[in-house]
Design a protein with these regions (language model features):
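Beta-strand elements of well-folded, non-transmembrane domains
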Residues: 13, 58-60, 109-113
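Short beta-strand element of the conserved SAM-dependent methyltransferase core
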Residues: 10, 68, 91-93
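Short loop segments at secondary-structure junctions
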Residues: 13-15, 72-73, 96-98
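Beta-strand/loop substructures that line and gate deep hydrophobic ligand-binding cavities in soluble
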Residues: 79-136, 152-154
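Glycine-rich portal/gate segments that line the openings of hydrophobic small-molecule binding cavities
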Residues: 30, 39-88, 102, 136-156
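Hydrophobic ligand-binding cavity/cleft-lining segments
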Residues: 1-44, 157
Length: 157
């Protein structure tokens, strides 16, 4: 059974610049929750079909593989695979008239393990931990967006 977790933030960037920051692998250590180091890039990142493999910090998710499934201007999605789960992570970039962009982050996932208590474990622990991780990622992403906005000639709010 597929499950979903969502989180959102607003950044002082255009959708194009917000997407550019989101897909900049050199910036991932500063905002992706649990990101340890990049292990491998296959293909032309961030184009459809490209794959990155990264390792988490100690005690984290282990090795994570992300393959680009959607690289459109307003949405970026990857098929994710790691020891505990697999699914799709998507980021949507929705511009507003005042020059800010809402970033909606979503993970649709299935657990790889869990046995007979998988559903209960997901409800009580895993889903909350994933949501917290998405929220921490987006908080740090928004903090990274402020200097990026200044470089683009915008004043962060």
């Amino acid at each position: 059974m597929s499950r979903a977790v969502v989180a959102a933030t607003v950044v002082p960037l255009s959708p194009e610049h917000a997407r550019g920051l989101w897909t900049d692998l050199e910036r991932w250590p500063s905002f992706v929750e649990g990101f340890g180091h990049l292990a491998e890039v296959r293909g032309e990142w961030p184009e459809r079909g490209a794959t990155v493999v990264w390792n988490s910090t100690p005690g984290g998710r282990g090795q994570v593989t992300e393959k680009v499934t959607d690289d459109s201007l307003r949405r970026f999605a990857t098929k994710i695979s790691e020891e505990a789960l697999q699914g799709e992570q998507s980021a949507a970039f929705v511009g507003a008239e005042d020059g800010v962009t809402r970033v909606d982050l979503r993970i649709d996932y299935e657990l790889s393990q869990g046995g007979p208590f998988q559903a209960m474990s997901d409800r009580l622990f895993i889903r909350r931990a994933l949501r917290d991780a998405l929220e921490r990622t987006l908080r740090r992403y928004a903090a990274e967006a402020a200097p990026a906005a200044r470089r683009c000639g915008r004043t962060p709010r």
